[in-house]
Amino acid sequence: MKSKAPYFIILFLVPLFLNAALSHTVFNLRCEQEETPVGLETLQPRFSWQTNATGRNFEQSAWQILVSDSPEQLQNNKGDIWDSGKVESSVSVLVPFAGKELKAGAVYYWKVRNWDKAGNYSPWSQVASFSVGLLSEKDWNGARWIALERDKKEELLPVGLHGFSSYVKKFPEGKKIGFYLLPQFRKTFTTNKTVKRAVAYISGLGQFELFINGKKIGNNFLDPGWTKYDKCALYLTFDVTNQIQNGDNTVGVMLGNGFFNIPSERYFKVLASYGAPRLKMKLAIEYTDGSMQNLVTGTDWKASASPVTYSSIYGGEDYDANREQSGWMMPGFNDKNWSKALDTNWQTKLLSQQSTPLHVRDSISPVRIFKNQKGQWVYDLGQNFSGIVRISVKASKAQYIKIWPAELLFADSTVDQRGSGSPYWFGYTPKADGRQENWQPQFTYYGFRYVAVEGAVPAGKSNAEGLPEIAELTGLHTCNFADEVGCFHCSKPLFNQIYELIDWAIRSNMASVLTDCPHREKLGWLEQSHLMQNSMQSRYDLSRLYAKIMNDMQSAQQADGMIPTIAPEVVHFEGGFRDTPEWGSAFIIDPWNIYQWYGDKRLIEKYYFDMQRYIDYLSSKANDHIVAYGLGDWLDLGPKSPGEAQLTSNGLSATATYYYDVTRMQKMAELLGKKDDAKKYTELGNAIKEAFNKRFWNPSKQQYEFNSQTASAMALFMELVPSENRQRVLDNLISDIRVHNNSLTTGEVGYTYLISVLQENEASNVIYDMNNIYNTPGYGWQLAHGATALTESWQGYAYLSNNHLCLGHLMGWFFSGLGGIGQADQSIAFKQIVIHPQPAGDVREAQTSYQSPHGQIVSNWKRSDKDFTLHVEIPANATASVYLPATNPENITESGILLKEANMPFRGESNKYTVVTIGSGSYNFNVKQ
């Protein structure tokens, strides 16, 4: 979302900000980019806020923050932990704490006020809170990792096996591994004083669900996020004050396998096992008299097998309701037949989960129910999504119900799991009491549109066999519950459909990692975290998820500095599938992009040394500054089936990426004040650029390598092209697109750069032409062939995934190109906004908004033969440059007033635009054509 166009003729200038804000308030308080974070993993939290100002041109001139360990103190305007005093600063994003030392496990309260340029101050904001997590092992008060069973040491596979063939090679006798009982744990305790605060700190591996007195705590799904468990695991923090009752209380926990233990049954992409599922927990209870009570896991807890009889992140889940033990989560339950929990004597580093958890985001009802030729009942949910099903069923016998999810159907309407991993199913055995039961899987998920049911019939259908009857089957779309921050809609139905197509793929692959697909692999392939970053962040606030992704990459980094293609690295692939520069470079590119979007440089500070190690690794792999290995432009459109690059050498794309990494490192070194490093990376970048052009530029043909779209786009975007050749290379790119009848040939690496280069050079009409077609592989092709989420291949092949993240780069153009919301080159966190819509083709209007760290930005435009209208909203404490398609200011009005009379600076550019500089507020521009 950067605007790189230069400014030219200054036409008119008057003082900016003549209208000071008359009144303002502070709202949307955030600590570490979350409203009320619990269990922070830092003693130096950062505070952010936004300002609601009447009128226009609000600029913050100062702020004051109060932090206290008591809300009563704040009510009296006393910050006993930190009173910043009045600080002269316009910064309102990620202001660092500078008060007394914070304590692990403690909760704090804060509020803020600010001043405008005229010296007027706001009322104090509402009070917000944050709490600190457990920062060392001693903070856990002796809590142990407990389990129901001992680990089977001969079956431990912390480095996973890839697929069935490697499993057979490792275990030639075909022995099943990873088969442990799925445990549930309970512990009863007594409180006889008034509870002030109760907090649960819990990690259950692979996944857990926590209950107190029979009530599930929180709405999260698949907690905790998956990691490289021998390096670190995540714990969750829950405020459970309201769940603790006077007298006896019971904690109950159920565990699933997740990625911690993957059994060798049904489908598995990867086979890995760290041992039996296990639990570590501390419940800290603070009483009003100041005393504390800590309940921690140990051998005094009780354990039993749960009704979950099969749990696999890859193969599905089975649940037998007849194995339920009524009341086991409640006080008074007789657990004499339960086992004592076992101490595993296992250790790993525990970190607080700071990324947004997974939730059920949507419920999806069937659009059609029918019987297929196999006699199964098929539910068509109308949408391919990540998630599970929920069923309501009545049964007179304990009949096993098998539920097959699938993206596609074969011609006979049976499920097609070829591209999504087979066999996978949900299994449920109801009780035989004739009562309605509700069930949904707890510890697995899949990507699907269709559901085929065996062993049950829809209620009201013929049921001669007396099978269980399903009163309702609903799809539950599960994904990372990151805030939606961007919206886009335009007058062209096809583009709105493409927007939805990409959005479903983004949502379906936002888990605790950014997966490639929500079924077959569920792995954190790293290339998409930077190639898709702008597109994803236009729609969702991923600031917290990327903090986890960076930690995953650091945990996966090898001794020689190599960053593998996936993180967490649950399996070691081979060749380019383990080590490819365009994938590992996410470790360099991601934190730079995070800094630009959110103003967060802490990731750069934290991982700078390890990022240097990766640059050194790439340098060690280079031959005369050329890096030539890996997968290259994956999934490009060549003569062969999709896969490794066909039209562009991996040397060109890898070296271009290497150069881009080095130039980012130079910028980050300057940001951190590391002048010697900045000089070193400048010199290295110059050497790579020279070598790149020497190797790949063909002076006789005036083109890069084979003149592929990817070669031209990457060279232009990375600024590898000498200035005298830039126009020629741009012409080559556009010419190749036209020669291919406006079709793309790039893969997932090249396409994002192609879109960016065309937009930067105001060639959005070319982007429009490329995506306004149905008859060649691309988005229109996928839609024409029935896709409801982005597919793995441009061709939408049925044998590949039909819900895949990696090719959704047009989403970024919808927001920054067609919609026109971006930021200036040197802007951070959208402090200096650029509104520059590029209408294209027959699109007559577009409505675009983005909730930036400073507040909401709006760009709504509409054009006709007579005029062009643009409604703009800029948040307080930010400014904007607005591009209007006219060179004569006499043709421009704002809210009915001629631009020359509107007290707004403006200037002309490129004999095409008038650029108006505005402050915060709402504006309505009209340009007569």
Task: Show which residues each predicted segment covers.
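C-terminal capping/lid segments that line or modulate ligand- or cofactor-binding pockets
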Residues: V251, Y319-D320, E521, R539, ...
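Active-site acid/base region of carbohydrate-active enzymes
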Residues: Q207, G298-A305, Y450, P458-L501, ...
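Alpha-helix capping and helix-loop boundary segments enriched in small/acidic/polar residues
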Residues: E173-Y180, V199, I217, G225-Y229, ...
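Extracellular/oxidizing-compartment recognition motifs
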Residues: H24-V107, K111-R520, Q528, R544-A547, ...
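Alpha-helical support elements that line or immediately flank enzyme active sites
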Residues: A198-I202, I212, I388-E407, V451-A456, ...
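Helix-terminus loop motifs that line ligand-binding clefts
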Residues: K215, N219-D230, A411-W425, S543-E644, ...
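Non-catalytic C-terminal accessory modules of carbohydrate-active enzymes
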Residues: L271, G275-K282, N294-G332, L351-S363, ...
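Bacterial Sec-dependent N-terminal signal peptides
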Residues: M1-T25
